[in-house]
Amino acid sequence: MNSRDSFKIVVLGGGESGVGAALLAQAKGFDVFLSDKGALSEEYRSILRTHSIPFEEGQHTEERILAADEIVKSPGIPDKVPLVKKLYAQGTPIISEIEFAS
């Protein structure tokens, strides 16, 4: 297994729990990136910037997401979404925000 600082976690979904998961991943020493297909609130953008957590909104950069060692997925993102199907097909572990926090 990779050391924590090189273990790549992508958080899919930038709502309250997604931003919380990104902060937790960073606090645990992981290399974290947050991606949201929609727009983030200004509050969440500010939190991510303050903590120097890279993020994107309005898109999912497939190449970056598929390179993750683990995905923390918002429950609002269905498993039938093509990107999630690709992640499952390549064997990338996908866990919920609640699982990650426990």
Residue spans for each PLM region:
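N-terminal leader/targeting and accessory segments in enzymes
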Residues: 1-96, 100
